[in-house]
């Protein structure tokens, strides 16, 4: 599992040419500031020297062990920093949680957001502390666990979204490209919504239809994106995107 995760992380950075995941304040042409955006795109000026593939494929077992230990240490530090950085105020939870769903990149992302992979790896580390028997019985596949609602996640561009609703309830135009010092990067949004081809399109899974009406519905949260309002003013605003699929219930009357 560790080797698989390390391979995914290496692939993530190799394909995305990602810049460090830190809050950035990038200035493009015209001194337009972009505060609080995680720039995961191909920013050559920010990435520094590139490491060749041969530097990551050592045949020595000691080198592999050292590499694994290094990655685990870095990942654990990222998880700790992410937990410390999360605000405790209820109003800021959505904005903090879904910041990772926006990516600036020169090409289509090939992997889910890195924080999603970190969360999966954290769950793996927690499971590693269990005994083999407990871990085997806690495997969702062995317990036959199924999601109440089937969902699907994918990266979409501003060309797909075109418009969105901001926090004031107004409709704004989502700009496809963001100017940076070395050119332009596209805005990508990692959206999660109910799967129209799933088995729960007629209702939630596991709900007693004799007593309840159920429906799987896509819900939205706010993320920051570069937009233009009806007065042609360009700026960073919080907009709503699809982020989850939840089950809604209403009790049947007259029974």
Swiss-Prot record:
The UniProt record lists the keyword Glycoprotein: yes
Marked site: Cleavage: 57-58
Domain of life: Eukaryota
Localisation per UniProt entry: Secreted
Membrane spanning stretches: none
Family according to the record: Belongs to the NGF-beta family.
Protein name, per record: Neurotrophic factor BDNF precursor form
Biological source species: Cavia porcellus (Guinea pig)
Biological classification of the source: Eukaryota, Metazoa, Chordata, Craniata, Vertebrata
